[in-house]
Design a protein with these regions (language model features):
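Sec-dependent bacterial lipoprotein signal peptides
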Residues: 1-22
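Generic detector of short alpha-helix boundary/capping microenvironments
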Residues: 10-11, 30, 80, 109
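Primarily secretory-pathway and cell-envelope proteins
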Residues: 22-68, 101-201
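Short, acidic Ser/Thr/Gly-rich low-complexity loop/linker segments typical of extracellular
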Residues: 70-81
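Short, surface-exposed beta-strand/beta-hairpin micro-motifs centered on an aromatic residue
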Residues: 81-88
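A short tyrosine-centered beta-strand micro-motif
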Residues: 90-97
């Protein structure tokens, strides 16, 4: 009886802990009917200038960010080397906490403290987020650059969401405009011979 009672008391606490620790999933391209204002959007591009021993080129698997007001965590699946994202969020300050890079079966993560603000209403362009990935090595890094390509971005917005064609779009780029972060590989590693964990140097 005591064991059952203890479980009943502990179970709600476990649920609360799990709900606080889990990130709320957001679509990167919501349906037209699901759009609400305020809306923020931007473009993500990932590339690697130096050659790599891996078959697959890097792409952004997902990014995580949190609200500074209520500490709620969000996760957006991107799964592309180049893609726009559109997010309907509550007004306030937000900070990106982590991004995940994927190369075939390999995954790595980096903490990138980008910040952005969501206004009380309207549509805001957050800029182009450029992720330059170092080739695989033991001290791999990621360079993030924030650029403005507002004309191209607004065209993409109006083509994808015609109902917003007459909406005034404000520009408020994420900050800082340049940062570097360490990339850490995420286990487990793929068990394929044609994958190279690091360059053979």
């Amino acid at each position: 009886m005591l064991t059952v009672l203890a479980f009943r008391l502990a179970f709600p606490v476990m649920l609360v802990g799990m709900s606080m620790g889990c990130a709320y999933q957001l679509p990167s391209h919501p349906f037209q009917e699901d759009l609400t204002e305020p809306l923020v959007f931007g473009h993500i591009q990932v590339w690697q200038e130096e050659p790599s021993g891996r078959i697959y080129l890097p792409e952004l698997a997902s990014l995580e960010f949190s609200s500074r007001e209520d500490q709620r965590r969000y996760r957006v699946e991107i799964e592309a080397a180049s893609s726009y994202f559109f997010l309907s969020l509550k007004p306030g300050q937000y900070q990106v906490t982590r991004v995940f890079i994927q190369e075939g079966g390999f995954r790595s993560s980096a903490e990138v403290p980008l910040t952005f603000e969501v206004p009380d209403q309207g549509v805001v362009y957050l800029g182009g987020w450029r992720f330059q990935v170092d080739p695989p090595n033991y001290t791999r890094e990621l360079e993030v650059t924030i650029v403005s390509e507002s004309v191209k971005a607004i065209v993409e917005l109006t083509v994808r969401y015609p109902s917003l064609s007459s909406t005034v779009v404000l520009s408020s780029l994420a900050e800082p405009s340049l940062l570097r972060a360490r990339l850490f590989e995420v286990t487990p590693y793929p068990r394929f011979r044609y994958f190279n964990r690091h360059n053979s140097t």
